[in-house]
Amino acid sequence: MRGKLLSFSLFGESHGKAVGVLVEGLPPGIEVSVEELKRELERRKGIERFATKRKETDEPKILSGVFRGRTTGTPVAVIVENRDVDSSYYEEIRNTPRPGHADYPAGIKYFGYNDYRGGGHFSGRLTVGVVIAGYFAKKLLEREGIKVRAYLKRIGRVEAHVSPEELLSSENPYCPDEGAFEAMVEEMERARKAGDSVGGIVEAVAFNVPPGLGGPWEEDIEADIASALFRIPAVKGVEFGLGFGLAELRGSQANDPFVLKDGKVVTETNNHGGVLGGMTTGMPLVVRAAFKPTPSIYLPQRTVDLGRMEEVTLKLRGRFDSCIVPKALPVVESSVAFVIADHLLRRRAWEGMVR
Protein backbone atom coordinates (compact mmCIF):
# COMPACT_ATOMS: atom_id res chain seq x y z
CA MET A 1 0.00 0.00 0.00
CA ARG A 2 1.48 3.30 -1.08
CA GLY A 3 0.48 6.48 0.66
CA LYS A 4 2.03 9.85 -0.04
CA LEU A 5 4.48 9.74 2.89
CA LEU A 6 3.96 6.30 4.42
CA SER A 7 3.93 3.01 2.53
CA PHE A 8 4.43 -0.72 2.89
CA SER A 9 4.98 -3.62 0.53
CA LEU A 10 4.35 -7.30 1.23
CA PHE A 11 6.45 -10.25 0.13
CA GLY A 12 6.45 -14.03 0.47
CA GLU A 13 4.04 -16.88 -0.19
CA SER A 14 1.78 -19.03 1.97
CA HIS A 15 4.04 -22.09 1.69
CA GLY A 16 7.33 -20.30 1.05
CA LYS A 17 10.12 -19.86 3.58
CA ALA A 18 8.67 -16.69 5.08
CA VAL A 19 6.28 -13.79 4.67
CA GLY A 20 7.18 -10.23 5.46
CA VAL A 21 6.78 -6.52 4.99
CA LEU A 22 8.89 -3.47 4.18
CA VAL A 23 7.57 -0.28 5.80
CA GLU A 24 8.86 3.06 4.50
CA GLY A 25 8.33 6.62 5.69
CA LEU A 26 8.15 6.03 9.44
CA PRO A 27 9.55 8.95 11.46
CA PRO A 28 12.52 8.21 13.71
CA GLY A 29 12.06 7.69 17.43
CA ILE A 30 8.88 5.57 17.52
CA GLU A 31 9.13 3.18 20.47
CA VAL A 32 8.93 -0.47 19.38
CA SER A 33 8.17 -3.51 21.55
CA VAL A 34 8.57 -6.96 20.01
CA GLU A 35 6.27 -8.36 22.70
CA GLU A 36 3.54 -5.90 21.73
CA LEU A 37 4.01 -6.84 18.10
CA LYS A 38 3.70 -10.53 18.98
CA ARG A 39 0.41 -9.84 20.76
CA GLU A 40 -0.94 -8.14 17.64
CA LEU A 41 0.06 -11.14 15.53
CA GLU A 42 -1.52 -13.47 18.08
CA ARG A 43 -4.86 -11.68 17.58
CA ARG A 44 -4.65 -12.52 13.87
CA LYS A 45 -4.98 -16.23 14.70
CA GLY A 46 -8.65 -15.77 15.58
CA ILE A 47 -10.85 -18.21 17.50
CA GLU A 48 -9.03 -21.55 17.55
CA ARG A 49 -12.11 -23.74 17.06
CA PHE A 50 -12.95 -22.09 13.74
CA ALA A 51 -9.43 -21.40 12.49
CA THR A 52 -7.13 -23.48 10.34
CA LYS A 53 -5.30 -26.36 12.00
CA ARG A 54 -2.09 -24.94 10.59
CA LYS A 55 -0.17 -23.79 13.66
CA GLU A 56 2.35 -21.03 13.06
CA THR A 57 4.33 -19.46 15.89
CA ASP A 58 4.52 -16.11 14.06
CA GLU A 59 7.79 -14.94 15.59
CA PRO A 60 8.63 -11.56 14.01
CA LYS A 61 12.25 -10.90 13.08
CA ILE A 62 13.07 -7.21 12.64
CA LEU A 63 15.85 -7.01 10.07
CA SER A 64 16.29 -3.25 9.73
CA GLY A 65 14.99 0.17 10.67
CA VAL A 66 14.86 -0.37 14.45
CA PHE A 67 17.79 0.30 16.78
CA ARG A 68 17.76 0.18 20.57
CA GLY A 69 14.00 -0.19 20.62
CA ARG A 70 13.14 2.77 18.40
CA THR A 71 12.65 3.39 14.70
CA THR A 72 15.63 4.97 12.97
CA GLY A 73 13.71 6.68 10.16
CA THR A 74 15.04 4.26 7.55
CA PRO A 75 12.98 1.42 5.97
CA VAL A 76 11.77 -1.18 8.47
CA ALA A 77 11.94 -4.78 7.23
CA VAL A 78 10.28 -7.57 9.21
CA ILE A 79 9.90 -11.26 8.34
CA VAL A 80 7.93 -14.12 9.88
CA GLU A 81 8.98 -17.66 8.97
CA ASN A 82 6.48 -20.28 7.80
CA ARG A 83 7.12 -23.32 10.01
CA ASP A 84 4.00 -25.50 9.68
CA VAL A 85 3.62 -26.08 5.95
CA ASP A 86 2.15 -29.14 4.17
CA SER A 87 2.14 -28.66 0.38
CA SER A 88 1.59 -32.28 -0.68
CA TYR A 89 -2.13 -31.98 -1.40
CA TYR A 90 -1.72 -28.91 -3.61
CA GLU A 91 0.25 -30.96 -6.14
CA GLU A 92 -2.84 -33.12 -6.61
CA ILE A 93 -5.14 -30.19 -7.41
CA ARG A 94 -2.77 -27.88 -9.29
CA ASN A 95 -4.80 -28.26 -12.51
CA THR A 96 -8.21 -27.84 -10.86
CA PRO A 97 -8.74 -24.22 -9.74
CA ARG A 98 -10.62 -23.98 -6.45
CA PRO A 99 -13.95 -22.13 -6.73
CA GLY A 100 -13.85 -18.77 -4.95
CA HIS A 101 -10.04 -18.66 -4.90
CA ALA A 102 -7.64 -16.68 -7.11
CA ASP A 103 -6.13 -19.87 -8.59
CA TYR A 104 -7.55 -19.49 -12.10
CA PRO A 105 -6.92 -15.77 -12.80
CA ALA A 106 -3.50 -16.00 -11.09
CA GLY A 107 -2.47 -18.87 -13.36
CA ILE A 108 -3.51 -16.83 -16.39
CA LYS A 109 -1.80 -13.62 -15.22
CA TYR A 110 1.53 -15.31 -14.43
CA PHE A 111 1.46 -17.77 -17.35
CA GLY A 112 1.43 -20.73 -14.97
CA TYR A 113 4.62 -19.76 -13.15
CA ASN A 114 2.83 -18.67 -9.97
CA ASP A 115 3.25 -20.49 -6.65
CA TYR A 116 -0.15 -22.16 -6.26
CA ARG A 117 0.52 -23.84 -2.90
CA GLY A 118 -1.99 -22.57 -0.37
CA GLY A 119 -2.84 -19.66 -2.62
CA GLY A 120 0.78 -18.50 -2.83
CA HIS A 121 1.13 -14.72 -2.72
CA PHE A 122 -2.68 -14.34 -2.76
CA SER A 123 -3.10 -16.15 0.56
CA GLY A 124 -4.49 -14.56 3.70
CA ARG A 125 -1.16 -15.57 5.24
CA LEU A 126 0.25 -12.36 3.74
CA THR A 127 -1.91 -10.32 6.15
CA VAL A 128 0.80 -11.02 8.73
CA GLY A 129 2.68 -8.20 7.02
CA VAL A 130 -0.37 -5.92 7.12
CA VAL A 131 -0.67 -6.39 10.88
CA ILE A 132 3.04 -5.65 11.33
CA ALA A 133 2.79 -2.46 9.27
CA GLY A 134 -0.34 -1.52 11.21
CA TYR A 135 1.46 -1.99 14.51
CA PHE A 136 3.95 0.74 13.59
CA ALA A 137 1.13 2.99 12.37
CA LYS A 138 -0.77 2.50 15.63
CA LYS A 139 2.32 3.44 17.63
CA LEU A 140 2.54 6.64 15.61
CA LEU A 141 -1.14 7.41 16.18
CA GLU A 142 -0.81 6.76 19.93
CA ARG A 143 1.30 9.90 20.17
CA GLU A 144 -1.72 11.90 18.99
CA GLY A 145 -4.23 10.06 21.18
CA ILE A 146 -5.82 8.35 18.15
CA LYS A 147 -7.13 4.81 18.67
CA VAL A 148 -8.52 2.36 16.11
CA ARG A 149 -10.76 -0.46 17.35
CA ALA A 150 -12.56 -3.16 15.37
CA TYR A 151 -15.19 -5.73 16.30
CA LEU A 152 -17.42 -8.38 14.74
CA LYS A 153 -20.43 -6.49 13.46
CA ARG A 154 -22.00 -9.51 11.78
CA ILE A 155 -21.42 -13.23 11.30
CA GLY A 156 -23.81 -14.75 8.80
CA ARG A 157 -27.23 -13.38 9.75
CA VAL A 158 -26.31 -12.52 13.34
CA GLU A 159 -25.70 -8.80 13.87
CA ALA A 160 -24.26 -6.95 16.86
CA HIS A 161 -25.34 -3.50 18.02
CA VAL A 162 -22.47 -1.65 19.66
CA SER A 163 -21.98 2.03 20.52
CA PRO A 164 -18.55 3.68 20.20
CA GLU A 165 -18.43 4.02 24.00
CA GLU A 166 -19.07 0.29 24.45
CA LEU A 167 -16.36 -0.54 21.93
CA LEU A 168 -13.77 1.48 23.85
CA SER A 169 -14.65 0.04 27.25
CA SER A 170 -15.30 -3.62 26.35
CA GLU A 171 -12.88 -6.37 27.38
CA ASN A 172 -14.29 -8.87 24.86
CA PRO A 173 -11.63 -9.04 22.11
CA TYR A 174 -14.17 -9.93 19.42
CA CYS A 175 -17.50 -8.23 20.12
CA PRO A 176 -18.80 -6.07 23.01
CA ASP A 177 -22.36 -7.32 22.42
CA GLU A 178 -22.12 -10.52 24.49
CA GLY A 179 -25.50 -11.89 23.45
CA ALA A 180 -24.80 -11.37 19.77
CA PHE A 181 -21.31 -12.85 20.14
CA GLU A 182 -22.72 -16.07 21.61
CA ALA A 183 -25.10 -16.33 18.65
CA MET A 184 -22.19 -15.66 16.27
CA VAL A 185 -20.22 -18.53 17.78
CA GLU A 186 -23.23 -20.80 17.25
CA GLU A 187 -23.48 -19.62 13.62
CA MET A 188 -19.80 -20.43 13.03
CA GLU A 189 -20.21 -23.81 14.72
CA ARG A 190 -23.12 -24.76 12.47
CA ALA A 191 -21.04 -23.94 9.40
CA ARG A 192 -18.08 -25.92 10.72
CA LYS A 193 -20.13 -29.02 11.45
CA ALA A 194 -21.68 -28.85 7.98
CA GLY A 195 -18.23 -28.78 6.35
CA ASP A 196 -19.11 -25.31 5.10
CA SER A 197 -18.06 -21.74 5.90
CA VAL A 198 -19.65 -18.42 6.80
CA GLY A 199 -18.76 -14.77 6.17
CA GLY A 200 -19.41 -11.57 8.06
CA ILE A 201 -18.76 -7.88 8.59
CA VAL A 202 -16.05 -6.13 10.59
CA GLU A 203 -16.71 -2.60 11.82
CA ALA A 204 -13.77 -0.37 12.70
CA VAL A 205 -13.96 2.92 14.58
CA ALA A 206 -11.14 5.45 14.78
CA PHE A 207 -11.38 7.73 17.82
CA ASN A 208 -9.93 11.23 18.32
CA VAL A 209 -9.15 11.72 14.63
CA PRO A 210 -8.64 15.47 14.09
CA PRO A 211 -10.77 17.28 11.52
CA GLY A 212 -9.29 18.20 8.16
CA LEU A 213 -7.36 15.03 7.27
CA GLY A 214 -7.79 14.08 3.62
CA GLY A 215 -9.11 16.22 0.80
CA PRO A 216 -10.94 16.13 -2.53
CA TRP A 217 -10.33 13.67 -5.35
CA GLU A 218 -6.82 12.17 -5.10
CA GLU A 219 -6.50 13.29 -1.46
CA ASP A 220 -9.75 11.60 -0.36
CA ILE A 221 -9.15 9.73 2.93
CA GLU A 222 -12.37 7.75 2.44
CA ALA A 223 -11.13 6.48 -0.93
CA ASP A 224 -7.73 5.61 0.53
CA ILE A 225 -9.25 3.63 3.40
CA ALA A 226 -11.61 1.82 1.03
CA SER A 227 -8.68 0.98 -1.24
CA ALA A 228 -6.67 -0.38 1.70
CA LEU A 229 -9.58 -2.53 2.90
CA PHE A 230 -10.30 -3.95 -0.55
CA ARG A 231 -6.70 -5.18 -0.67
CA ILE A 232 -7.47 -7.58 2.18
CA PRO A 233 -8.24 -11.05 0.77
CA ALA A 234 -11.98 -11.90 0.96
CA VAL A 235 -13.22 -8.29 1.36
CA LYS A 236 -16.06 -7.71 -1.12
CA GLY A 237 -17.72 -4.57 0.24
CA VAL A 238 -16.87 -1.39 2.16
CA GLU A 239 -19.13 1.34 3.56
CA PHE A 240 -18.76 4.37 5.84
CA GLY A 241 -21.29 5.56 8.43
CA LEU A 242 -24.74 4.43 7.36
CA GLY A 243 -23.28 3.62 3.95
CA PHE A 244 -25.87 2.17 1.60
CA GLY A 245 -28.50 2.92 4.23
CA LEU A 246 -28.20 6.61 3.35
CA ALA A 247 -29.83 5.85 -0.01
CA GLU A 248 -33.12 5.14 1.80
CA LEU A 249 -33.24 8.47 3.67
CA ARG A 250 -34.29 12.03 2.92
CA GLY A 251 -31.68 14.76 3.22
CA SER A 252 -33.41 16.02 6.36
CA GLN A 253 -32.80 12.61 7.94
CA ALA A 254 -29.32 11.95 6.57
CA ASN A 255 -27.63 15.27 7.35
CA ASP A 256 -25.57 15.48 10.54
CA PRO A 257 -26.40 18.84 12.22
CA PHE A 258 -23.42 20.80 13.57
CA VAL A 259 -23.58 21.77 17.25
CA LEU A 260 -21.24 23.06 19.96
CA LYS A 261 -20.13 20.77 22.77
CA ASP A 262 -17.61 21.90 25.38
CA GLY A 263 -16.54 24.66 23.03
CA LYS A 264 -15.90 22.30 20.12
CA VAL A 265 -17.78 21.85 16.85
CA VAL A 266 -19.31 18.35 16.66
CA THR A 267 -22.30 16.76 14.94
CA GLU A 268 -25.45 15.55 16.68
CA THR A 269 -25.43 12.36 14.64
CA ASN A 270 -22.69 10.57 12.72
CA ASN A 271 -24.52 9.15 9.72
CA HIS A 272 -21.59 9.96 7.44
CA GLY A 273 -19.08 8.08 9.58
CA GLY A 274 -16.85 11.04 10.36
CA VAL A 275 -16.03 11.92 6.73
CA LEU A 276 -17.41 14.68 4.47
CA GLY A 277 -15.94 15.66 1.10
CA GLY A 278 -13.14 13.15 1.57
CA MET A 279 -12.05 14.88 4.79
CA THR A 280 -12.39 13.91 8.44
CA THR A 281 -14.88 15.92 10.51
CA GLY A 282 -13.45 15.20 13.95
CA MET A 283 -16.21 12.72 14.75
CA PRO A 284 -15.38 9.01 15.14
CA LEU A 285 -14.46 7.57 11.74
CA VAL A 286 -16.73 4.53 11.22
CA VAL A 287 -16.13 2.02 8.43
CA ARG A 288 -17.32 -1.53 7.73
CA ALA A 289 -15.78 -4.26 5.57
CA ALA A 290 -17.79 -7.25 4.34
CA PHE A 291 -15.95 -10.58 4.14
CA LYS A 292 -17.14 -13.40 1.91
CA PRO A 293 -17.28 -16.94 3.34
CA THR A 294 -14.00 -18.86 3.23
CA PRO A 295 -13.91 -20.44 -0.26
CA SER A 296 -12.12 -23.59 0.96
CA ILE A 297 -14.87 -25.91 2.20
CA TYR A 298 -15.24 -29.67 2.63
CA LEU A 299 -18.34 -29.99 0.42
CA PRO A 300 -18.13 -31.12 -3.25
CA GLN A 301 -17.78 -28.25 -5.73
CA ARG A 302 -17.76 -28.06 -9.51
CA THR A 303 -14.65 -26.91 -11.35
CA VAL A 304 -12.66 -27.61 -14.52
CA ASP A 305 -9.61 -29.84 -14.94
CA LEU A 306 -7.43 -27.51 -17.00
CA GLY A 307 -5.15 -30.34 -18.11
CA ARG A 308 -7.95 -32.41 -19.64
CA MET A 309 -10.31 -29.44 -20.23
CA GLU A 310 -13.32 -31.17 -18.73
CA GLU A 311 -15.70 -30.39 -15.88
CA VAL A 312 -15.00 -32.31 -12.67
CA THR A 313 -16.15 -32.42 -9.05
CA LEU A 314 -13.60 -31.20 -6.52
CA LYS A 315 -13.71 -32.30 -2.87
CA LEU A 316 -11.01 -30.49 -0.96
CA ARG A 317 -8.88 -31.97 1.79
CA GLY A 318 -6.66 -29.90 4.02
CA ARG A 319 -6.63 -27.45 6.91
CA PHE A 320 -9.25 -24.74 6.46
CA ASP A 321 -10.98 -22.00 8.45
CA SER A 322 -14.75 -22.26 8.76
CA CYS A 323 -14.79 -18.50 9.39
CA ILE A 324 -11.93 -16.07 8.80
CA VAL A 325 -13.74 -12.97 10.04
CA PRO A 326 -12.47 -13.08 13.68
CA LYS A 327 -8.91 -13.29 12.33
CA ALA A 328 -9.54 -10.17 10.25
CA LEU A 329 -10.08 -7.78 13.18
CA PRO A 330 -6.42 -6.71 13.56
CA VAL A 331 -6.01 -6.68 9.77
CA VAL A 332 -8.86 -4.20 9.34
CA GLU A 333 -7.60 -2.11 12.27
CA SER A 334 -4.11 -2.07 10.77
CA SER A 335 -5.31 -1.05 7.32
CA VAL A 336 -7.38 1.84 8.69
CA ALA A 337 -4.61 2.94 11.07
CA PHE A 338 -1.99 2.96 8.33
CA VAL A 339 -4.04 5.24 6.07
CA ILE A 340 -4.86 7.63 8.93
CA ALA A 341 -1.18 7.75 9.90
CA ASP A 342 -0.19 8.66 6.34
CA HIS A 343 -2.77 11.44 6.19
CA LEU A 344 -1.74 12.69 9.64
CA LEU A 345 1.88 13.03 8.49
CA ARG A 346 0.70 14.97 5.43
CA ARG A 347 -1.33 17.30 7.64
CA ARG A 348 1.59 17.91 9.98
CA ALA A 349 3.77 18.83 7.00
CA TRP A 350 1.19 21.44 5.91
CA GLU A 351 0.89 22.83 9.42
CA GLY A 352 4.64 23.27 9.62
CA MET A 353 4.64 25.34 6.44
CA VAL A 354 1.51 27.41 7.15
CA ARG A 355 2.33 28.24 10.76
Curated annotation (Swiss-Prot):
FMN binds at H121, F122, S123, G277, K292, P293, T294, P295, S296, R319. InterPro entries: Chorismate_synth, Chorismate_synth_AroC_sf, Chorismate_synthase_CS. The keyword Lyase applies. GO terms for molecular function: chorismate synthase activity; FMN binding. Keywords: Amino-acid biosynthesis, Aromatic amino acid biosynthesis, FAD, Flavoprotein, FMN, Lyase, NADP. Disulfide bonds: none annotated. It comes from the Archaea. GO terms for cellular component: cytosol. One of its GO terms (biological process) is chorismate biosynthetic process. It is an enzyme of class 4 (lyase). Its EC number is 4.2.3.5. It holds the Pfam family Chorismate_synt. Reduced FMN (FMNH(2)). Its cofactor is FMNH2. HAMAP family: Chorismate_synth. PANTHER family: CHORISMATE SYNTHASE. Belongs to the chorismate synthase family. This is Chorismate synthase. It comes from Thermococcus kodakarensis (strain ATCC BAA-918 / JCM 12380 / KOD1).
